[in-house]
Amino acid sequence: MGKNVLLLGSGFVAQPVIDTLAANDDINVTVACRTLANAQALAKPSGSKAISLDVTDDSALDKVLADNDVVISLIPYTFHPNVVKSAIRTKTDVVTSSYISPALRELEPEIVKAGITVMNEIGLDPGIDHLYAVKTIDEVHRAGGKLKSFLSYCGGLPAPEDSDNPLGYKFSWSSRGVLLALRNSAKYWKDGKIETVSSEDLMATAKPYFIYPGYAFVCYPNRDSTLFKDLYHIPEAETVIRGTLRYQGFPEFVKALVDMGMLKDDANEIFSKPIAWNEALKQYLGAKSTSKEDLIASIDSKATWKDDEDRERILSGFAWLGLFSDAKITPRGNALDTLCARLEELMQYEDNERDMVVLQHKFGIEWADGTTETRTSTLVDYGKVGGYSSMAATVGYPVAIATKFVLDGTIKGPGLLAPYSPEINDPIMKELKDKYGIYLKEKTVA
């Protein structure tokens, strides 16, 4: 008979989840997308079932969930409350890779009352990052130490040899989400004080971050790191920063786009018809003409450059993007989405290219006798040509493992769960390492 698992979503992460679960004889997977063809493409390799489903249709959702033991929600997090409400009605367990949102938190009493397990935050970031943060923090506390600082940086990037464009970045999914994240403000603990960075200044705060000599990384902070003092039970920490890794040159390039207003998503007539890029920029920036010289003069009046060399590099990058050419824009009604269409044309992964995931935690430890120690936990993982991308594997495998453990009772509620305790984390870590070779290398560096 076996257990029934429903997977919602058609993103690039879904494939390893479906394939991994369907490889178990006692698990039957159904893939549900709004578009049946998408579900069929994902279900085909494993011979799983595919259906069309609109998650905003409560009765249709309830009907499908009632036939399943667990639902995996890999759709945008704004739809999770809808899925969880249906799961409460149908008494179905839930797994997601997203952060627990305030909207889900509000449903917690009903989740507990229904007796279901809703397991969240179990991908890469959030997910694998929690596993190894909690592990070291728990070890330090048990040994009588204090955690004085916690830095955590993660990046999904092209492998160095495939980072061959001016941004040093490629898109394995929608570029919109990547660019929107660059408009967030940031908040973190630094030396016992909360520091904030406005969205306008985020790229300007990026600084080099050393992990291994072979990589030229820069880092900048993510949204709100202050919450992790409580979530990781480290009230003693004076510095708590979680952030993003990119290759050097990325922040300055993005900052110039921000200065030009290219990350704005308010409706604009200029980007609503298929005119040439140089004409669109002339109108948008108020340049004298469509000549490259006049367009650059307009950019110069809006952007602030680090130095002449950086200016040359970024402007030649804009030329590579075709912003000064008479190539037609793909009109999307605003600057951001029109730019996204261009980036997605030029910056996709080719079939023979690999992505790379880098994650590092840095722990500043103070022992009871006053001595200090610095430890790192580091993951560098590459995608497989002809197989899963690293991002798909490092998000997908933890989701699949967590689902299996919810099914067999290793992870058990009822309630809203996330990987913040050794009881939940240790079995997931073990399976990730033993079965898939995914683990963080732990070192004492000082």
From Swiss-Prot:
Keywords assigned by UniProt, alphabetized: Amino-acid biosynthesis, Lysine biosynthesis, NADP, Oxidoreductase
GO BP terms in the entry: lysine biosynthetic process via aminoadipic acid
GO CC annotation, single: cytoplasm
Binding-site positions, NADP(+): 10-13, 33-35, 54-55, 75, 97-98, 124-126, 174
Top-level division of the source organism's lineage: Eukaryota
GO molecular function, one term: saccharopine dehydrogenase (NADP+, L-glutamate-forming) activity
Transmembrane segments: none
Residues bound to L-saccharopine: S98, Y99, D125, R223, T244, L245, R246
Coiled-coil blocks: none
Keyword NADP set for record: yes
Listed SUPFAM superfamilies: Glyceraldehyde-3-phosphate dehydrogenase-like, C-terminal domain, NAD(P)-binding Rossmann-fold domains
Pathway(s) this gene product operates in, as recorded in its UniProt entry: Amino-acid biosynthesis; L-lysine biosynthesis via AAA pathway; L-lysine from L-alpha-aminoadipate (fungal route): step 2/3
Top-level EC class as recorded in UniProt: oxidoreductase
Reaction(s) this enzyme catalyzes, per UniProt: L-saccharopine + NADP(+) + H2O = (S)-2-amino-6-oxohexanoate + L-glutamate + NADPH + H(+)
EC number(s) from the headed UniProt entry: 1.5.1.10
Miscellaneous remark of the record: Present with 57500 molecules/cell in log phase SD medium.
Protein family membership: Belongs to the saccharopine dehydrogenase family.
Assembly mode: Interacts with TRM112.
Name of the protein: Saccharopine dehydrogenase [NADP(+), L-glutamate-forming]
Protein source organism: Saccharomyces cerevisiae (strain ATCC 204508 / S288c) (Baker's yeast)
